[in-house]
Amino acid sequence: EIMPSLVGSEMCIRDSHIALPEYNQAASSESAILYGIRKEKACAPQLNSGLFAAMKEMGDVRGVFVGHDHDDDYAVSWKGILLAYGRYTGGNTVYNHLTNGARVIELDENANSFRTWIRLKEGVVQQVTYPADFIKE
């Protein structure tokens, strides 16, 4: 079960530029279900501020969306919260090995879930529903 205590509460998502240290823990976990591309380790702070633990304690945050690492666009569930990267959208940068695009998030507050996908010029890729697509049978 991913969100047993969250049914009926408000659904929140968080947007940030830099990934939390938990991104590396989640992406390297053998039990994790990960969708998307991970070409580099998250450039997360070495000092863990406890922000993820605080969001978990609050109980309403369903997803955290970040950027910064241009060669990542994955989504992975960690302790009941989806940790996902956007997609590099364009402009001048030091590096970028993925096609430009964007992450779209569609909330469904009635179902206490959301869909997210990467939108490219050529169409949609990596469409997932959270939490349904991250539950192990």
Residue ranges and their predicted role:
Residues E1-G8, C12-I13:
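Single conserved hydrophobic/aromatic residue that forms the stacking wall/gate
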Residues I13, G63-F65, A84:
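Hydrophobic/aromatic beta-strand patches that form the interior of the parallel beta-sheet core
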Residues S16-I18, I118:
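A cross-domain feature marking catalytic cores of carbohydrate-active enzymes
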Residues I18-N24, V61-S77, G91-T93:
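Active-site environment of divalent metal-dependent phosphoester hydrolases
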Residues P21-G50:
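Flexible internal linker/loop segments at domain or repeat junctions
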Residues I37-K39, M55-G63, G67:
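N-terminal short leaders/motifs
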Residues A44-P45, G67, V94-L98:
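Short amphipathic alpha-helix initiation/capping segments at coil-to-helix junctions
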Residues G50-M58, D72-E137:
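Binuclear metal-dependent phosphoesterase catalytic core
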